[in-house]
UniProtKB/Swiss-Prot annotation:
It is an enzyme of class 2 (transferase). HAMAP family: Homoser_kinase. The keyword Transcription does not apply. InterPro entries: GHMP_kinase_C_dom, GHMP_kinase_C_sf, GHMP_kinase_N_dom, GHMP_knse_ATP-bd_CS, Homoserine_kinase, Ribosomal_Su5_D2-typ_SF, Ribsml_uS5_D2-typ_fold_subgr. GO terms for molecular function: ATP binding; homoserine kinase activity. It comes from Staphylococcus carnosus (strain TM300). This is Homoserine kinase. It comes from the Bacteria. Its EC number is 2.7.1.39.
């Protein structure tokens, strides 16, 4: 009897302005993966659709590298796999495409390597690879997650937050922005007083979210000093999107992850009007309402 694993892996958005490298939301765009043991003892990757056409099909593939990491860490052997993938998540746009692939690799290693990892152990492994849990944790659990990775002790801490009861609008530019390039513009250090202020803003923003005070939360989201002032310069559409969103009383407009996607939080009654306006005025971008994913990754075992 042959066995296959089918994965439906959500996208994610990270930071929400002031939650740099620590807050993330799962989103209803998906990476679909099907895998089975290869007949010829070789790894095979087949990519469907435009979003994945530039990915490698050899040992440079992220999923292969993640499986190799898990094999070494847990001292198991995963048989070579035949993997088919298609994705609704655009690459290098700040919507967690690499985190989705990373988590998929962990699930494949867990299933075909018979590791029996818990969800939290998967988060730990993903965070060790990624360096922070803001994307990978919501991909696994769904919803909204805050977290911290102590790279001195190799410990991961996460906490769950009720997702905001707002609509999310994403504006996706036509160009890519690699996370590495987006991090290159960030300063190496901050003055102590500035860091204290930015941390206080982040703490207060989370408290406002928990209290469903989206006006206050949104105002604070736009007060980040850790990354947004530097990354906005790489996204020429940002200020225009933010200005238009304010006309519709949006709670906040921030950069999704490392960008260039722009995320707007808005009252559901105004989100459709905003999307139509943005699509009318920004020819080189695509705007849409996107739903918060609350289930996380879905894995289905198929036996034939």
């Amino acid at each position: 009897m042959s066995e296959r694993l089918k994965l439906k892996v959500p996208a994610s958005t990270a930071n929400l302005g002031v939650g740099f490298d620590s807050i993330g939301l799962a989103l209803n765009k998906f990476l679909y993966v099907e895998a089975e043991i290869s007949d010829d003892q070789k790894w095979h990757f087949h990519h469907k659709g435009e979003n994945l056409h530039d990915l490698p099909t050899d040992e440079n593939h992220l999923i292969y590298q993640v499986v190799q990491f898990l094999e070494k860490r847990f001292e198991v052997t995963v048989p070579p796999l035949k993997i088919t993938m298609r994705s609704e998540i655009p690459l290098a746009r700040g919507l967690g495409s690499s985190a989705s692939a990373l988590v998929a690799g962990i699930y494949l290693a867990d299933f075909f390597g018979q590791l029996q990892l818990s969800e939290f152990e998967m988060v730990e492994a993903a965070t060790e690879i990624e360096g922070h849990p803001d994307n990978v944790a919501p991909v696994i659990y769904g919803g909204m997650v805050s977290g911290f990775y102590n790279n001195h002790t190799n410990e991961t801490y996460i906490s769950f937050i009720e997702p905001p009861r707002v609509n999310l609008v994403i504006t996706v530019p036509s160009y890519e922005l690699k996370t590495h390039d987006s991090r290159q513009v960030l300063p190496d250090s901050f003055k102590h007083g500035d860091a204290v202020q930015y941390s206080a803003i982040s703490n207060t923003m989370l408290s406002a979210l928990i209290q469903h005070d989206y006006v206050l939360a949104g105002k604070l989201m736009e007060m980040d000093g850790f990354h947004e002032p530097f990354r906005q310069k790489l996204i020429p559409e940002f200020e225009k999107v933010k200005s238009i969103a304010k006309e519709y009383k949006a709670y906040a407009t921030v950069i999704s992850g490392a960008g260039p996607t722009i995320l707007t939080l808005i009252d559901p009654s105004k989100s459709g009007k905003l999307v139509r306006r943005l699509n009318k005025e920004l020819d080189e971008c695509s705007s849409e309402i996107i739903i918060i994913n609350k289930s996380g990754i879905i894995a289905e075992k198929v036996y034939e």
